[in-house]
């Protein structure tokens, strides 16, 4: 019975860790390119595990497309000056991101320039804000 329990726990752990890894995969993002669009905020979702910025952008056919940018969670965004109230529906923004490889409008958020010229970034990860201490030199 003990062997069965340990085997089951091991199997569940392996299966779960694969799902977590896939969730954070960047396989669908073209990290070699950036795209910049200008438009109007349709929705800003401030939350975990990811925040989202939806921007309505005029297209070449006279219509509009909604661009979806996946962002870091609030804990990272605040390190770049973001607040839950930084943007709201109707605000004009210029957004730069790493595009989806399949051509869908959107990607991974890099930065936004607000109407007043303020630039807000993606938010530093903890290791970028507090890098590991370096050994003292004599």
Task: Give the predicted meaning of each segment.
Residues 79-95:
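Short nucleic-acid-contacting surface segments enriched for D/E, G, S/T with interspersed K/R
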Residues 47-58:
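Short aromatic-glycine-enriched beta-strand elements
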Residues 37-41:
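Conserved hydrophobic positions within beta-strands
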Residues 20-35:
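Short boundary/loop segments of OB/S1/cold-shock single-stranded nucleic-acid-binding domains
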Residues 100-124:
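OB-fold/S1-family single-stranded nucleic acid-binding modules
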Residues 1-8:
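Bacterial N-terminal signal peptides that target proteins for export
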Residues 9-10, 20:
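Cleavable N-terminal signal peptides
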């Amino acid at each position: 019975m003990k062997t069965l329990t340990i085997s089951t726990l091991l199997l569940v752990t392996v299966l779960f860790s694969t799902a977590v890894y896939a969730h954070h995969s960047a396989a669908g993002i073209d990290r070699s390119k950036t795209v910049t669009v200008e438009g109007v905020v349709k929705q800003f979702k401030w939350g975990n595990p990811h925040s989202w910025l939806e921007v309505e952008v005029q297209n070449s056919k006279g219509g509009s497309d909604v661009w979806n940018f996946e962002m870091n969670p609030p804990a990272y965004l605040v390190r770049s000056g973001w607040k839950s109230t930084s943007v709201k529906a109707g605000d004009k923004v210029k957004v730069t991101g790493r595009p989806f490889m399949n051509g869908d409008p959107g990607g991974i958020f890099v930065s936004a320039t607000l109407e007043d010229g303020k630039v807000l970034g993606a938010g530093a990860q903890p290791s970028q804000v507090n890098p590991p201490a370096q050994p003292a030199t004599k």
